[in-house]
Amino acid sequence: MEQNLNSEQKPQSSAKPRGKSSRSTILAQTVKTGIIKSNLIPMWAGLTLGMYKNKMTFIDNIPEMIFSTVGSALVIGAAGAFNNVYDRDIDAIMPRTQSRPTVTGEMSAKSTLSLAIVMLIIGLAVLALASPLAAAFGLLGVFLYVVPYTMWTKRRTIYNTEIGSISGAVPPLIGWSAVSTDITHPAIARFIFVMVIWQMPHFYAIAIRKRVDYEAASVPMLPVVKGMRRTYYQTNFYLILLILSSFLFGSLSVGIMLVALLLSIAWLVMSIYGYHSNKDQVKWATKMFVFSLFHMTILFTTVIVYSLVGVIFKLY
């Protein structure tokens, strides 16, 4: 990491020159606002679920909702910025990441690192206003994403996806711990398990779509090292596991369980049918990726709505 930070020379890139980006665009690319938004959904699911299961009121927890949202956005953005600093050498090789400010030179590594540190400190302070435990999980999430995933496993093993899925499951814990210290409650434990499983076929789809990029950058993603067939079988394994894990929601709500079950079955059917009927593997993977986002958004939004209705109308 030290070698990466001290080298301020712009990595060689085959990207075509482009016009100067606005400051807002540069900032958005640096902190990865798309990832921030997508991670706030499960954070809110964990938050509202925690309020519901612990029989809390909406009004009394407005400060915690604000602090956990702002704090989570900041620490997730910090993690993205740290990742941009460390990965800028391979980002310069892959077309999908060549426009990142740390590659184009619009943001230096030192400036990006400084931004990440400031965002992390402020984000943790804001999360601490919700609860010290939420801040602790925020720090844990950043650590897991930056060190075990980005620095240790991403460039070394095909199991980088499994390691990355652990950090990806932290946002619901941040939300839950903002309002409750009972982190062993079955509701959040089951939610975290589903979150970990969901990430596997999601990131396998990304790896297939960008297989050429990862291969060029020598990133050992599963389809690069083991090929498409192994990735397809492993994707289906996790989708079957996701179907089975849908029943974990049964004790919370039959409705949520059915939503999770139907979405997961549809995803598996799409995987099997799409793989065998479509010779274009990238096109198949793109559909799988899009559906994974649909799956997450619908399922977690259902959890949020169910929990909020229960909290507002006190349906404990």
Curated annotation (Swiss-Prot):
Domain of life: Bacteria
GO cellular component, as recorded: plasma membrane
Entry keyword Transferase: yes
InterPro entries on file: Protohaem_IX_farnesylTrfase, UbiA_prenyltransferase, UbiA_prenylTrfase_CS, UbiA_sf
Misc note: Carbon 2 of the heme B porphyrin ring is defined according to the Fischer nomenclature.
Subunit structure: Interacts with CtaA.
PANTHER family: PROTOHEME IX FARNESYLTRANSFERASE, MITOCHONDRIAL (PTHR43448:SF2)
Protein name: Protoheme IX farnesyltransferase 2
The encoding gene: ctaB2
